[in-house]
């Protein structure tokens, strides 16, 4: 990785023009995995803007449109006169063909979706070291009917004659498949060929370089002013705390609001870690009773979220006034927050998609609009996996770097129905057992999330020849790459048995354990 400053001051080596593809962000991530800096920008970005950025390559993303339909998204045609290598992916390839004099029509046979063997006709340039017959991921209903003058075929599939094409003398390339998705077995080979062999990029997107430049940028931006950070204990805010502490030290104040819905031992661990071990200035705000009292009698999940969000804002306002004044508010905004999926928020100056709101603090609601802070967002050009690498390099322990995603409202939305002290204690104990056994089995880092849910019903059971009526606990473990989709994790029966036995024997008030085997979609990862 390079740095957030690279994003702000250094030009990207590769620009991805986004035509509405669900994979545009993934293309950027894959390029960064090759240690080359990339940015996603709107397809409306002008050729003049791109010329000023001086990228070494341009990628035209896929998209849901058809180039021959009215209203289809088109890029500035002058892009093809910049003398910069271009790679069109799926819709991007069709657009390039259409713009340069070829033709695109609905697929004559049938649309091609899913895995397809790629037959390589010309194993040079873009397809160097791509094995003929390797699997590539297809997702298109249109196909190229006629190539523009000078273009040649590089590969085909059984349903797509022009699966990869090239205009070698201008370094224009197109692929009908998606090299960025994990199902394309040689997709990264294609991406590396374009980035290094065709665009002649240098590997300069490294973690250490990011840290050095980000520290310098924060120091320049902040000067001798004071910065406030709302610390949740998640990987984003924790990494940001370490980075800012390295940059400005005592000018940073972290506010940790304990709303009473964290997992067992977490508040104590976070305070001992940040405040005592690393001497980062953390103000601990114990608001447990305040939050739970507001939830008395509340069973609707949306109401719970709104109440927790409202109270967080009130506590944040009160405490920032007490601890301040502060000049800057630090936020753990990440690049996916900047890349708005709707594509409607376009910066007219840069052509980039932009976030238009202050990021909600760990999903519990936006911060007050009238807080007069300037923003410090040094992570805003990083993806989640890049943040983990930065955190690791800064010295964050695996307990935080590899911490599973945790909802802002915490255990309050893993207790269905009303939240009480008794239910919280019960769920904390059960949740700890789930995580302990997953960790003992060496599975923690292989699973996206693993947690327990408490149901607001009584289940009949028998313990010691006595009939019992107690709560059931749901075990929820899912595998995912980004949380957008997820599948339930196939845990070994022995691990499930240990989890079940320990919960019913060690957790008071529970007599049954069930396993949630619902994928997302149709379900969500959380129950509320």
From Swiss-Prot:
Question: Where along the chain is ATP bound?
Answer: 232-238
| InterPro entries, per database record | Class_I_gatase-like, GATASE, GMP_synth_C, GMP_synth_GATase, GMP_synthase, GMPS_ATP_PPase_dom, NAD/GMP_synthase, Rossmann-like_a/b/a_fold
Q: Where along the chain is the active site annotated?
A: 90 (nucleophile), 178, 180
Q: Do you know which PROSITE patterns this protein is assigned to?
A: GATASE_TYPE_1, GMPS_ATP_PPASE
GO terms, molecular function: ATP binding; GMP synthase activity
What EC number is given for this enzyme? 6.3.5.2
Q: Which residue range or ranges hold the GMPS ATP-PPase domain? A: 205-403
Question: Which catalysed reactions does the entry list for this protein?
Answer: XMP + L-glutamine + ATP + H2O = GMP + L-glutamate + AMP + diphosphate + 2 H(+)
Which keywords belong to this entry? ATP-binding, Glutamine amidotransferase, GMP biosynthesis, Ligase, Nucleotide-binding, Purine biosynthesis
Q: Which residues form the Glutamine amidotransferase type-1 domain?
A: 13-204
Q: Out of the domains of life, which is the source?
A: Bacteria
Report if keyword Calcium is assigned: no
Q: How does it assemble?
A: Homodimer.
Q: Which HAMAP family match?
A: GMP_synthase (MF_00344)
* PANTHER family with a match to the protein in the record: GMP SYNTHASE [GLUTAMINE-HYDROLYZING], GMP SYNTHASE-RELATED
Q: What is this protein called?
A: GMP synthase [glutamine-hydrolyzing]
User: Which species does the entry assign this protein to?
Assistant: Prochlorococcus marinus (strain NATL1A)
What would be the name of the gene that encodes this protein?
Answer: guaA
């Amino acid at each position: 990785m390079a740095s957030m400053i690279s994003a702000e001051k250094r030009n990207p080596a590769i620009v991805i023009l986004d035509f509405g593809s669900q994979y545009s962000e993934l293309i950027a991530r894959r390029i960064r995995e090759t240690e080359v800096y990339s940015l996603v920008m709107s397809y409306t970005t002008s050729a003049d803007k791109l010329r000023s950025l001086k990228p070494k390559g341009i990628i035209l993303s896929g998209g849901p449109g058809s180039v021959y339909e009215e209203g289809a998204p088109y890029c500035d045609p002058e892009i093809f006169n910049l003398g910069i290598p271009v790679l069109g992916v799926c819709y991007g390839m069709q657009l390039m063909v259409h713009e340069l004099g070829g033709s695109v029509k609905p697929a004559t046979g049938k649309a091609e979706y899913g895995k397809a063997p790629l037959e390589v006709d010309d194993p040079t340039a873009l397809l160097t070291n791509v094995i003929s017959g390797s699997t590539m991921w297809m997702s298109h209903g249109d196909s190229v009917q006629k190539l523009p003058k000078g273009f040649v075929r590089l590969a085909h599939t059984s349903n797509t004659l022009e699966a990869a094409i090239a205009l070698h003398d201008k370094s224009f390339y197109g692929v009908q498949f998606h090299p960025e998705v994990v199902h394309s077995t040689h997709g990264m080979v294609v991406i590396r060929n374009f980035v290094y062999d065709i665009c002649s990029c240098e590997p300069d997107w490294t973690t250490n370089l990011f840290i050095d430049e980000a520290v310098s940028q924060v120091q320049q931006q902040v000067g001798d002013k004071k910065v406030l950070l709302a610390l949740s204990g998640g990987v984003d805010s924790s990494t940001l705390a370490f980075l800012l502490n390295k940059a400005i030290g005592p000018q940073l104040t972290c506010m940790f609001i304990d709303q009473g819905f964290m997992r067992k031992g977490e508040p104590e661990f976070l305070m001992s870690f940040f405040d005592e071990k690393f001497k980062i200035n953390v103000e601990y705000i114990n608001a447990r009773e305040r939050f739970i009292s507001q939830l008395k009698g509340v069973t609707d999940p949306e109401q719970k979220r709104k109440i927790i969000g409202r109270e967080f804002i009130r506590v944040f306002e009160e405490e920032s006034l007490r601890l301040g004044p502060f000049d800057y508010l630090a936020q753990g905004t990440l690049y996916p927050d900047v890349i708005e999926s709707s594509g409607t928020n376009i910066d007219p100056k840069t052509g980039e998609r932009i976030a238009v709101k202050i990021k909600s603090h760990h999903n519990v609601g936006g911060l007050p609009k009238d807080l007069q802070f300037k923003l410090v967002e040094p992570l805003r050009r990083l993806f989640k996996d890049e943040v983990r690498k930065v955190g690791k390099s800064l010295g964050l322990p695996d307990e935080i770097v590899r911490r599973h995603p945790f909802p802002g409202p915490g255990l309050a939305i893993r207790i269905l129905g009303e939240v009480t002290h008794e239910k919280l204690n019960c769920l904390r104990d059960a949740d700890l057992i789930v995580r302990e056994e997953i960790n003992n089995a060496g599975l923690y880092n292989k699973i996206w999330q693993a947690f327990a849910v408490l149901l607001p019903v009584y289940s009949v059971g028998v313990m010691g020849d006595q009939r019992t009526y107690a709560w059931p606990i749901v075990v929820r473990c899912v595998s995912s790459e980004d949380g957008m989709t997820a599948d339930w994790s196939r845990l070994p029966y022995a691990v499930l048995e240990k989890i079940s036995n320990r919960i019913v024997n060690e957790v008071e008030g529970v007599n049954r354990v069930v396993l949630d085997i619902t994928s997302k979609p149709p379900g969500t990862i959380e129950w509320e």
